[in-house]
């Protein structure tokens, strides 16, 4: 199985992340931020990537360090699990509807991190989570995992639906991208013979 495990300990956060790309969408998530937990659980369930995420962060300061560091560690764990990326689909895309909301996510596990995030929120918090941190979470995951990531809200008004639609779209796109394609015979999905750089 393709698995990754990252322990990241700083003066601001203590984090343990484990992922299994060949999982069933099982999760055990505790970040101290309820809405972030809910979104990571959605990611796991709809990508079928098993995720354990345990975070002890300095939430008495604010939510930035916990959000950023957990995303970095998740991206690193995904990168470790992907290894040399031999045989993967590499690309993934999904339209993700949720009631009045529709979002689109497209990504390339290219080894060249880049994020385009075209979505906004009309309220400052979802639960207790600062909505300004949502874009930063995706940027941090993409940077650490080496993913080119494009996220676009096509339309929608309910902030909860917008966020959940984006996370589910990301999950479904990742499921496509990490799945192994037997026709590739274990080859690296690039004419260069490697991904990144």
From Swiss-Prot:
Reactions the enzyme catalyzes: D-erythro-1-(imidazol-4-yl)glycerol 3-phosphate = 3-(imidazol-4-yl)-2-oxopropyl phosphate + H2O
Protein EC: 4.2.1.19
InterPro entries associated with the record: IGPD_sf, ImidazoleglycerolP_deHydtase, ImidazoleglycerP_deHydtase_CS, Ribosomal_Su5_D2-typ_SF
Superkingdom, natural source: Bacteria
Cross-referenced SUPFAM superfamilies: Ribosomal protein S5 domain 2-like (SSF54211)
GO terms classed as biological process: L-histidine biosynthetic process
Annotated pathway: Amino-acid biosynthesis; L-histidine biosynthesis; L-histidine from 5-phospho-alpha-D-ribose 1-diphosphate: step 6/9
The entry's keywords: Amino-acid biosynthesis, Cytoplasm, Histidine biosynthesis, Lyase
UniProt-recorded Gene Ontology molecular function terms: imidazoleglycerol-phosphate dehydratase activity
Top EC group: lyase
Location in or out of the cell: Cytoplasm
GO-annotated cellular components: cytoplasm
HAMAP family for this protein: HisB
Record family assignment: Belongs to the imidazoleglycerol-phosphate dehydratase family.
Official protein name in the record: Imidazoleglycerol-phosphate dehydratase
Native organism: Erythrobacter litoralis (strain HTCC2594)
């Amino acid at each position: 199985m393709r698995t990754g495990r990252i322990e990241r300990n700083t003066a601001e956060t203590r984090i343990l992340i484990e992922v299994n790309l060949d999982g069933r969408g099982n999760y055990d998530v505790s970040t101290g931020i309820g809405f972030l937990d809910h979104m990571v659980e959605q990611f796991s369930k709809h990508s079928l990537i098993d995720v354990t995420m345990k975070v002890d962060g300095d939430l008495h300061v604010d939510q930035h360090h916990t959000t950023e560091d957990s995303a970095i560690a998740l991206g690193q764990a995904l990168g470790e699990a992907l290894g040399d990326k031999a045989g993967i689909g590499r690309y993934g895309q999904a339209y993700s509807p949720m009631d009045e909301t529709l979002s689109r996510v497209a990504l390339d596990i290219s080894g060249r991190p880049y994020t385009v995030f075209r979505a906004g929120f009309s309220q400052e918090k979802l639960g207790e989570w600062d909505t300004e941190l949502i874009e930063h979470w995706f940027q941090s995951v993409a940077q650490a995992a080496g993913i080119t990531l494009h996220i676009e809200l096509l339309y929608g008004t309910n902030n909860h639906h917008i966020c959940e639609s984006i996370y589910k779209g990301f999950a479904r796109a990742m499921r496509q991208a990490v799945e192994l394609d037997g026709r590739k015979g274990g080859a690296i999905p690039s004419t260069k013979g490697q991904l990144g750089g």
